Amino acid sequence: MIAIASFVSIGLLASLDQFLDNPYLIASFGATAVLIYGAPDAPFSKPRNVFFGHLFSAIIGVTVSFIFVKCGYMEELRWLACAIFVSLAIMVMKITNTVHPPGGATALTCAMCGFATVEYIIRPIMLGIIVMMIIAYAVNILRGCLIADISEPNGQ
């Protein structure tokens, strides 16, 4: 069941990515799939952590990327941008109690690829996470497991 859920979610997003010629899949979704399908009871796999961990990290990545690009320093200071993006993402996830390790990779993707648009937050991030979470909910219902509400910190 776990492998099927991962196959369906990553396959669907990869298909959208390929056939619509737009980004719908990013590398951090692979790690998210491992957590939400393979370890659904882990604190980092809770819906609140998955959703907000990626969302906050994408917002940080886009905002700081925008600043670096507008100042004209993205290329020569990409190393600094990478360090800032991931560090800020970790800090915000800790403060908001929404730590989701793949979120760090979501922020890092902004630095490495130079994403500086709000569209990146919507697609691939939010669309991809919503697709993956819907599939996770369906799988957990089929397995007879109830997963925590999105409003509960760390599913507690």
Where are the regions that the model predicts?
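Membrane-helix boundary connector in multi-pass membrane proteins
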Residues: 96-121
